[in-house]
Every structure is written in structure tokens, then in C-alpha cells.
């Protein structure tokens, strides 16, 4: 299992309700997480708006479908997962409300996302220095478009914002909508900067170790208050 999938999988498994049978993943990508959950014995339905991603998920045995949230409806679920997808979905209020309406009793909405608006100069200096270190060791592909945009700019924060201004919801907006469900909300910060390097890592054997070290450094430094963690996680606990 790739490190980034394991990182999300461990979070999701920690918060799945007891006797969780039916799971919906919104924004499944190529289906790696959904496949892992299916192997655990859960009935997983996975949707994505990209036909190629859905086809890839189907090839690994996932019940994946081309569909757009919140227009999709396939009965009730014990858990609805938004795996780095909710910041893209419009309208946000309807997306959250439909997820809540889709839950069975004691079901849960589990969200993994990122606070792109939280990036500051100090945090991005750490991010750039870490990426440059990996690049210097030959661990990163030189042609990764996003990383080259950030590394080539003298104003890193400006470059970051230019790459995250395409109608993306902020973590604060997501949190506000989740609070409107009138259910308890669990919140966690998490590592996420490592994901920007994930597709560029070229040293296959060491890939998971490299990304794990990247993520652990983000977690440690953010816990100390030295940087701001990028990842945000939310869990809605629906009452019986």
C-alpha cells in the first residue's frame, strides 16, 4: 500500500462506526482506498466525476461509478467519506446536507481535506527547503509542474496562492458547514504537504519511507508551533 493511502486509511479506520457495513467514498480517484476498505469486508460504493479514474478503480475491483455529488443517490450508508474532494464540490451547503441525509443511524461523515489558506511564509520556506533537499538527492523528478512553479518563484507565498485560487472552499468554510449539521464535530490537523511531492518521487524502493519522513516532519514541527500543518480532518458523529 502506498504511504499516502495508508495515511488516509488509518484515519478512516479509526473513525468508522461499529458494525460499519456500507461505505460511500466521494472522490475516489483510482480507487486504492476503496479497494483496501472492500478487502476489509465493507461494502464500498465509490464515485468520481472523472471517467478514467473510475475505470482505473473498476480495474482493481471497486464498485466505482461516474457521478457528481450531491446529485448521486444510492440509499443509505454507515459512513460517507470525502477524501480530499469536499473543497471542490459546489454548492458546499447542499453537499454536506445530502451527506448527512444519506447516513444511517449512528453513521458518520469522515472528511480529509486541506487548509490551503493557512499557508504562510514560514511554513512555505520549510516546504521549499525540504523539496530542494529531496531534489538535490535525486529523489524527485525535475519536470513536476507544480513543484517547479513553486521552486522557481522568489515570492513563494504568491505562487502558492495563484495555484490555489480556483474556487476552492477553505477549511474554515468546510468547518462552518459541517457545524450546521447540529452534530458533534471532531477536528484534527494532519500532514498534507508531502502529497505535493508524492507524484514526483522517483526512487521507487524508498518512496514510502521518503514520504513518511516528510509527513512526520510536518506533524512534529506543527505540533511544536514552528509551522502550520496543511491537512484538516473532520468527523461528524450522527446521534442515534
What are these regions (language model features)?
Residues 181, 188-240:
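C-terminal lobe and adjacent flexible extensions of AdoMet/dcAdoMet transferase-like proteins
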Residues 141-202:
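Substrate-binding/catalytic lobe of Class I Rossmann-like enzymes that use SAM or dcSAM, i.e.
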Residues 81:
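A conserved beta-strand element that flanks and buttresses the S-adenosyl-L-methionine
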Residues 20-27, 110-143:
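Conserved class I S-adenosyl-L-methionine
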Residues 94-105:
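A short glycine-rich, Lys/Arg-flanked "PGG" loop and its adjoining helix->strand segment in the class I
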Residues 2-20:
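Conserved alpha-helix/loop element of class I SAM-dependent methyltransferases that forms part
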Residues 30-71:
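Class I SAM-dependent methyltransferase SAM/SAH-binding core
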Amino acid at each position: 500500500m502506498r504511504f499516502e493511502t495508508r495515511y488516509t486509511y488509518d484515519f478512516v479506520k479509526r473513525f468508522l462506526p461499529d458494525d460499519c457495513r456500507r461505505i460511500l467514498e466521494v472522490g475516489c480517484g483510482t480507487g486504492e482506498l476503496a479497494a483496501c476498505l472492500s478487502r476489509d469486508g465493507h461494502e464500498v460504493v465509490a464515485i468520481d466525476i472523472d471517467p478514467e479514474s473510475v475505470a482505473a478503480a473498476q480495474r482493481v475491483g471497486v464498485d466505482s461509478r461516474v457521478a457528481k455529488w450531491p446529485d448521486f443517490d444510492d440509499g443509505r450508508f454507515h459512513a460517507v467519506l470525502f477524501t480530499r474532494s469536499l473543497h471542490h464540490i459546489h454548492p458546499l451547503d447542499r453537499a454536506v446536507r445530502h451527506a448527512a441525509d444519506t447516513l444511517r443511524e449512528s453513521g458518520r461523515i469522515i472528511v480529509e481535506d486541506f487548509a490551503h489558506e493557512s499557508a504562510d511564509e514560514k511554513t512555505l520556506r520549510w516546504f521549499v527547503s525540504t523539496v530542494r533537499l529531496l531534489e538535490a538527492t535525486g529523489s524527485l523528478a525535475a519536470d513536476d509542474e507544480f513543484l517547479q512553479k513553486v521552486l522557481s518563484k522568489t515570492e513563494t507565498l504568491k505562487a502558492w496562492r495563484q495555484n490555489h485560487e480556483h474556487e476552492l472552499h477553505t477549511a474554515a468554510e468546510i468547518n462552518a458547514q459541517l457545524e450546521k449539521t447540529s452534530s458533534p464535530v471532531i477536528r484534527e490537523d494532519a500532514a498534507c504537504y508531502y502529497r505535493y511531492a508524492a507524484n514526483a518521487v522517483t526512487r521507487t524502493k524508498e518512496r514510502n519511507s521518503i514520504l513518511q519522513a516528510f509527513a512526520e516532519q510536518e506533524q512534529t514541527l506543527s505540533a511544536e508551533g514552528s509551522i502550520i500543518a496543511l491537512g484538516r480532518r473532520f468527523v461528524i458523529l450522527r446521534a442515534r
